[in-house]
């Protein structure tokens, strides 16, 4: 009997030829850990500063975040991925909701900075708010890149698409990585952080229109938040 993942000649089967019952081995803790940490920080910040304006009731955003955490852990876990296919649309929907929440949080912060509020009068509270929003933007955009690039984690594993939506250095120059290299969540998290920090692509190039637009939006939001928060914080300290 031929072993799973091997041809009759003993060579490993190509990922594109694998069926829906293929074992997907990307670990979930690199995804769960930063998201769980972000959820904990936002909850603690809400408890410490209850006067902070948020979108909807206090339980709304944490509920969406916790739901996303469970969906991402369950979708394409380290077992038969074909059985969890329906969870990916749920994960994308929850990430989209978080992206909307993040954009609203950016608008609220910018409005508070322009009009003034109790939170923005304190340099410490202002910097904490800015840091949380910046971190949330980087994390959420990283999740979006991870779920949308080349059809998602499973499609990348199976190499269903010939051309990526975002091209990493290892894909542009195969000599920089082992044979069969594929980006995992940590690569997309770093992409989200560097785009929010450098306000432009660094070692990862957007190839498709949606990726270019998403990076442009992320850079503009990050630039606006950082610029206004730092300017207001300097005034609050002086």
Model-flagged regions — what are they?
Residues 1-24:
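Short, Lys/Arg-rich, polar N-terminal cytosolic tail immediately upstream
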Residues 70-117, 122:
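Cytosolic-side membrane-entry/anchor segment at the start of a transmembrane helix
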Residues 182-238:
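Pore domain of cation channels
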Residues 115-154:
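Pore-domain transmembrane helices of cation channels
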Residues 45-58:
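Short, hydrophobic transmembrane alpha-helix segments
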Residues 21-34:
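N-terminal membrane topogenic signal
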Residues 56-70:
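Structural signature of hydrophobic alpha-helical transmembrane segments
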Residues 150-203:
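Membrane-proximal soluble regions of multi-pass membrane proteins
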């Amino acid at each position: 009997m031929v072993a799973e993942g091997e041809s009759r000649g003993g060579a490993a089967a190509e990922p594109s030829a694998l069926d829906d019952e293929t074992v997907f081995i990307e670990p979930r803790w690199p995804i769960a850990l930063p998201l769980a940490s972000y959820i904990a920080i936002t909850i603690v910040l809400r408890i410490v500063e209850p006067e902070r304006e948020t979108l909807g009731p206090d339980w709304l955003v944490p509920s969406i975040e916790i739901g996303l955490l469970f969906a991402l852990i369950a979708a394409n876990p380290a077992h038969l991925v074909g059985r969890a296919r329906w969870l990916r649309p749920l994960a994308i929907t929850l990430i989209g909701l978080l992206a909307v929440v993040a954009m609203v949080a950016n608008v609220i912060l910018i409005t508070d900075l322009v009009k003034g509020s109790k939170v923005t009068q304190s340099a410490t509270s202002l910097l904490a708010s800015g840091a949380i929003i910046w971190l949330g933007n980087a994390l959420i955009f990283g999740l979006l890149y991870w779920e949308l690039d080349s059809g998602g984690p499973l499609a990348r594993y199976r190499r269903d698409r010939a051309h990526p939506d975002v091209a990493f250095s290892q894909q542009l120059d195969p000599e920089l990585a082992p044979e069969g290299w594929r980006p995992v969540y940590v690569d997309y998290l770093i992409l989200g952080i560097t785009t929010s920090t450098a306000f432009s692509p660094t070692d990862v190039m957007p190839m498709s229109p949606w990726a270019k637009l998403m990076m442009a939006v992320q850079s503009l939001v990050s630039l606006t938040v950082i610029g206004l928060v730092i300017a207001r914080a300097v005034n609050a300290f002086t």
